Design a protein with these regions (language model features):
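Cysteine-clustered segments with highest specificity for TGF-beta superfamily mature ligands
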Residues: 1-53, 130-187
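Extracellular structured ligand-interaction cores
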Residues: 33-35, 57-63, 73-75, 106, ...
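A short "linker-to-beta-strand initiation" element
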Residues: 44-91
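A short beta-turn/strand-edge loop motif at beta-sheet boundaries
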Residues: 70, 100-103, 117-120, 230-239
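Extended extracellular/luminal ectodomain segments enriched in beta-structured repeat modules
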Residues: 70-73, 100-109, 217-219
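Extended serine/threonine-enriched, polar tracts that run as long, contiguous segments within proteins
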Residues: 91-157
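Low-complexity, acidic Ser/Thr/Pro/Gly-rich terminal tails and inter-domain linkers that flank the onset
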Residues: 199-225
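Short beta-strand elements of extracellular/lumenal beta-sandwich folds
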Residues: 216-234, 239-241
Length: 241
């Protein structure tokens, strides 16, 4: 059995919507690649009030974060919550941080969202650091949350979005946060997870010897410079060199 570690509850037009989160690392490590199923979450008796608005939807996902030593140093951050926008709510702003950005190269951001409809594109927008983004034709700039999957190219997720965007030109070296703005004049959209993968270089001392002088065969004078290039943090005091 799986029990939620955190639950999220919100309302829209006098209807309640909920989400939940729990860590299933042990299960995934034990079973590895394969097919995972979720059962015993029957809400049939509760969905009647949601049918009229077309918001009688349920879904789930597993987010897997893994390490590959052959890749560049990346900082992975998972932000979970349950933020909702629709024609009856105000636009939302989400501040993601702390994040250490060394470069926008190969930096990405992903969204897990519910209830977005492909047929409703009324005043819908997604901005990252003030820039309106999309990935047409799969994710138009005025209908980003439309039941699509950036990884497979599928447009048949039916109210579930797994969308990934490149952050080239949207983040700068030294940035410590990313600002997300989402709005909609009609379509109900629920932002459940946001995942960032940014190019991040940890503090790492590198040494350049500039002059070596031998004195009386038992004394050596060294002149050297310590570098901390392309790092997003200062070298801690006492770092061995």
């Amino acid at each position: 059995n799986i029990f939620a570690e955190r639950t999220f509850l919100t309302q829209n037009n006098n209807r309640e919507y909920f989400g939940a989160y729990t860590d299933v690392t042990d299960i995934v490590e034990a079973n590895g690649n394969g097919t995972y199923t979720l059962s015993n979450l029957d809400l049939t008796s509760n969905i009647g009030a949601y049918c009229g608005s077309g918001t009688d939807f349920g879904g789930w996902s597993i987010v897997v974060i893994y390490e590959d030593p052959n890749l560049l140093l990346n900082q992975i951050s998972l932000f979970d919550g349950f933020e909702i926008v629709s024609g009856s709510t105000a636009d939302i702003t989400i501040e993601l941080g702390p994040i250490d950005v060394a470069s926008d190269d190969l930096s990405r951001i992903g969204f897990l969202a519910w209830e977005g409809d492909a047929s409703i594109a009324n005043g819908e927008f997604l901005r990252i650091n003030g820039v309106l983004i999309g990935d047409p034709p799969l994710n138009p700039n005025n209908n980003q949350f439309n039941g699509t999957n950036s990884y497979t190219g599928s447009d048949e997720l039916w109210n579930m979005d797994l969308d990934v965007y490149e952050l080239d030109g949207l983040v700068d070296p030294g940035d410590t946060e990313i600002i997300i703005e989402v709005g909609s004049d009609q379509d109900l959209v629920i932002i459940h997870n946001i995942i960032t993968s940014v190019n991040s270089e940890l503090p790492d001392a590198t040494i350049s010897f500039e002059d070596i002088e031998f004195i009386c065969n038992n004394t050596v004078n060294l002149n050297y410079t310590v570098f901390n290039v392309n790092s997003t943090g200062s070298l801690p005091a006492g770092t061995p060199i």
